[in-house]
Amino acid sequence: MSTIRCDIVSAEKEIFHGEATLVVATGELGELGIAPKHAPLITRLKPGKVVVITANGEHLDFAISGGILEVQPQVVTILVDTAVRAQDIEEAAVRKVKEEAERLLANRGNTVDVAEAQRRLTEATVQLQALERLRRNLKH
């Protein structure tokens, strides 16, 4: 089976490095599926999911806060601000962050950084969606 190398990295660390049969990510114009021998491209990624199907068939689900995806003949590189594997997400902590961001946005005052509250809300929502996908996959 043909594979493509996949690297997911942030400014702080390498998050994933391995061979994949398919990489799925949410670009600005919709969902992208990157398979081996895909045409070269570069695009911005929206906050959302990145799913890597490894050479042995394992589905790895990541929640990302946005980034850049680049496809070259032998490698797909995903540069992200933040990324977390669905299985590593602490649901209670994420729900707390989401509720706090929603509260800040609902009670906007002069001291509220709206952009930061919206960023936190988006990031928490993306992580909770990743957890839900993980739970659905575990049921199958």
From Swiss-Prot:
Produces ATP from ADP in the presence of a proton gradient across the membrane. One of its GO terms (cellular component) is proton-transporting ATP synthase complex. It comes from Xanthomonas oryzae pv. oryzae (strain KACC10331 / KXO85). Belongs to the ATPase epsilon chain family. GO terms for molecular function: ATP binding; proton-transporting ATP synthase activity, rotational mechanism. F-type ATPases have 2 components, CF(1) - the catalytic core - and CF(0) - the membrane proton channel. CF(1) has five subunits: alpha(3), beta(3), gamma(1), delta(1), epsilon(1). CF(0) has three main subunits: a, b and c. The keyword Ion transport applies. This is ATP synthase epsilon chain. Its main location: membrane. It is found in: Cell inner membrane. InterPro entries: ATP_F1_dsu/esu_C_sf, ATP_synth_F1_dsu/esu, ATP_synth_F1_dsu/esu_N, ATP_synth_F1_esu_C, ATPsynth_dsu/esu_N. Gene3D superfamilies: ATP synthase delta/epsilon subunit, C-terminal domain (1.20.5.440), F0F1 ATP synthase delta/epsilon subunit, N-terminal (2.60.15.10). The lineage of its organism: Bacteria, Pseudomonadati, Pseudomonadota, Gammaproteobacteria, Lysobacterales. It holds the Pfam family ATP-synt_DE_N. Keywords: ATP synthesis, Cell inner membrane, Cell membrane, CF(1), Hydrogen ion transport, Ion transport, Membrane, Transport. It is a peripheral membrane protein. The keyword Magnesium does not apply.
